[in-house]
Regions:
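Hydrophobic membrane-insertion alpha-helices, especially the h-region
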Residues: 17-30
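Hydrophobic alpha-helical targeting segments used for export or membrane insertion
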Residues: 27-34, 210-213
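Signal peptide-directed extracytoplasmic domains
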Residues: 35-192
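N-terminal Lys/Arg-rich, disordered targeting/topogenic segments
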Residues: 1-11
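Bacterial extracytoplasmic/cell-wall-associated proteins, especially those involved in peptidoglycan
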Residues: 128, 134-139, 147-345
Length: 345
């Protein structure tokens, strides 16, 4: 009887010890392979190039991961032959464990980049923004957008290609090539130009590129949202009667003098197809990348008889509008007098 009790006790102790060992083993495995890899729980990223190896990837991960998870990742990588499946891209090292992170790396499950296309003055500015976040260089971008054949592929010229970059935030993979990048921007541009927007452009007897060119001028003329449709109406009125647009921002763009606070008569004869004082019609393309608000202001322009505008002499950022040259001259005189009074040159 005593022997049976001792045997039962030994069995019970053995089971308890086995259970403890199993629990410890499970805890260790979970700790090594399933707890978040990043230090302090903060998600960080690694960038894997085409020439990276498994060892160089481990080296990149080590500074941003906990020591135990970096070790565990390397062990799993060895077992699953990660050295044969290294894929370039941008990957998150965050709350996922070593096992799932290794799966992401092997299968190319990248963390997307949120790239914001801003309303900026030049393609060079867009190239700066894009190349800071993407794997392609600024040179790659500029070589593409100034190439007539590349532009023609998407239905543009080097002067109008900016129209393809509608200001918004887009998701990309870091290692997206410049060709694929441009294809996506074209797709997003086509999506932006809905049948409703196209119909409005057609009703105004404008192409989408012409709409965006006018919108770019408006964006430089004012930040006042309420005035934008009125100013759009002025330029459309001028186009209809074949009157020069005479837009000061186009002269600044032509001269690449964006710092000018005042234009003088001598500047208005600057020879450039972008100078709308010297040449009738629209400039060859946008003078900046207009916001959606500016584009929609043109599509929903106000119908009126104004053909003149002048900044108000109170420097409120708004404008005086006029139907006749006499009215405009009076408005312009007040503004010039105030410029002189304030010593603005």
């Amino acid at each position: 009887m005593k022997s049976k009790k001792n045997k039962s006790k030994k069995t019970s102790n053995a089971l308890t010890i086995s259970g403890i060992i199993l629990l410890v083993l499970i805890t260790v495995i979970y700790y090594l392979f399933f707890t978040g890899m990043s230090k302090n729980g903060e998600e960080k990223y690694i960038y894997i190039d085409n020439d990276d190896t498994a060892d160089s990837v481990y080296y990149k991960i080590k500074p941003i991961a906990t020591a135990h998870s970096a070790w565990a990742l390397q062990q799993v990588g060895t077992i699953l032959a990660y050295n044969e499946n290294v894929r370039s891209g941008r990957y998150a090292i965050g709350n996922e464990g070593a096992l799932q992170t290794l799966r992401n790396l092997r299968n190319g499950r990248q963390a997307p980049i949120h790239l914001t296309i801003r309303s900026v003055r030049t393609l060079d500015d867009i190239a700066d923004d894009a190349s800071k976040k993407m794997s392609f260089s600024k040179k790659d971008f500029m070589n593409a957008v100034i190439n007539p054949d590349t532009c023609a592929k998407y239905g543009y010229t080097p002067e109008t290609i900016m129209c393809m970059f509608i200001p918004n935030t887009y998701d990309f993979y870091w290692n997206t090539g410049i060709g694929e990048f441009l294809q996506k921007m074209k797709k997003e541009s086509d999506k932006f130009w809905t049948p409703e927007r196209k119909d409005k452009a057609e009703a105004a007897e404008l192409t989408p590129e012409q709409v965006m060119t006018i919108a770019s001028i408006i964006a430089e003329e004012t930040n006042n949202k309420d005035e934008k449709p009125t100013i759009a109406g002025i330029y459309i009125n001028r186009l209809k009667i074949n009157m020069p647009l005479q837009s000061c921002p186009t002269v600044k763009f032509a001269m690449k003098r964006f710092d000018l606070k005042r234009l003088y008569t001598s500047m208005l004869s600057y020879d450039s197809p972008y100078n709308t004082y010297k040449y009738k019609g629209l400039p060859p393309g946008p003078i900046r990348n207009p916001n959606i608000e500016d584009i929609d202001a043109v599509l929903n322009y106000r119908h009126h008889k104004y053909i003149y505008m002048c900044a108000k002499a109170d420097f409120s950022g708004t404008h005086d509008f006029a139907e006749t040259y006499e009215e405009h001259s009076a408005n312009s005189k007040r503004y010039d007098e105030e410029l002189n009074k304030r010593g603005i040159k």
